[in-house]
Amino acid sequence: MTITTPDPSRLTATQALALIRSNELAVETYARSLLSRIESRDETVKAWAYLNPEFILAQARKLDAVPVEERGPLHGLPVGVKDVIYTKDMPTEHNSPLYKDSHVPVDAAPVAILRAAGALIFGKTTTTEFASTTNGPRTYNPHDPTRTPGGSSSGSGAAVADYQIPMALGTQTGGSTIRPGSFNGIYAMKPTWGAVSREGLKVYSLVLDTLGVFARGVEDLELILGVLGVKDDEVSDGEWGAFQGVQGAKFGLVKTSVWPQAGPGTIAAMDKAAAILRSHGAIVEEIELPPEFDSMPAWHATIMAVDARTSFLSEYRRDKTKISKHLTGYVENNEGYTSAQHLAALDGIASLRPQIDGIAGRFAALLTPSVPDEAPVGIQGTGSAAFCSMWTALHTPVVNLPGFQGDNGLPIGVSLVAPRFRDQHLLAVAKEVGKLFEEEGGWKSSL
């Protein structure tokens, strides 16, 4: 059979997978639908750093020819890959002239895992330079092309939101997955640090870098993260306990020390999110983190700066005129960071990780802002990661949930956070809470 749906590009990954498995949708048909969408929208959004339609269709035909009994759990599902993640059959350029047309003949570990599961590696999505600056690539927010899609995983967030791809990989060192998720009105997850291999990803900070995933539904996040090996320990009812639904569940509302940076859109979104949860029988308790957490932004900034000095020294030595002044400043240590400051930041954050696990473990999840407000106007910058960086440094899993909007009608998300290595629990909570926020939050995509 062949699918009669006019536009398969509108399908979520799990919807498409069901149709491919039932032989109602050919992989080639699906790929052609996505390519048609990209062709019609690329001039507006510009989400792709590399795309080869002929190669995509050839790979799709090969996947269609695979016998049913030999097909993997992601058979035929297209995935976009941020252009700081190695792909053996596509260039990896890092949005840097130093790496123009650079080919590495291996897949990054996450790409290899997805490919082995039958995924169709579709192309490379745009990124800021080395996923390390706030200067945006020439990628535009699909909901309002006068605004940034966020970064540094700019193309992944924009492409998923614009129905150009059902799922995409990103990375996060500060807020590079959660921020584009919020600005583009889609689901995005930064799993627990270390839960997914980072082999084959451009290194910025070994203690912060984390693979991220974008999708248009929590079921899709569960699907891809399950294949990537993200799982929780078995727990007893008396320990964490399984999530039994929103009714009666406890949520901790955490504004954090950077709350003064919240704009009217995020303030309203947090208020509405709490109200929706309470209206469905949840208990929402606003909590203040211990004062030592106030040091998190400065500690995160210290680690970013010092680790960048190490990570980008090779590019600096090759030709410092071909990297941004932002990065040369890190390598030259313009801020004057010392090893003592670096150690204090590393040790300080490490001491807080067990604390946040204990705090978050008292609740179904913590509810916290994703971003200060709607996506800013212009593509010269990608917006602030102020509300994301703490959770990145603490290594906790975080999910952005869409559903809210700002003063200009653009999407704003909120985040749910759980203790480390409670990723599947967090996804179970996000699935139920996300439905409520989508239904009652007030924002719907018009794309």
Where are these regions (language model features)?
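Glycine-rich, small-residue loops and helix-cap segments
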Residues: N23, G76, K82, A116, ...
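A short helix-breaking turn/cap at a secondary-structure junction
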Residues: K190-A268, K272-A273, L436-L447
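Glycine/threonine-rich flexible loop motifs
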Residues: T92-D101, G263-P264, A375-T382
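Acidic/His- and Gly-rich active-site-bordering loop/insert found
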Residues: I56-A58, V66-G136
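An N-terminal boundary/leader segment
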Residues: M1-L57, S279-G281, Q341, G442-L447
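Short glycine/serine-rich loop segments
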Residues: V106-L225, L394-G413
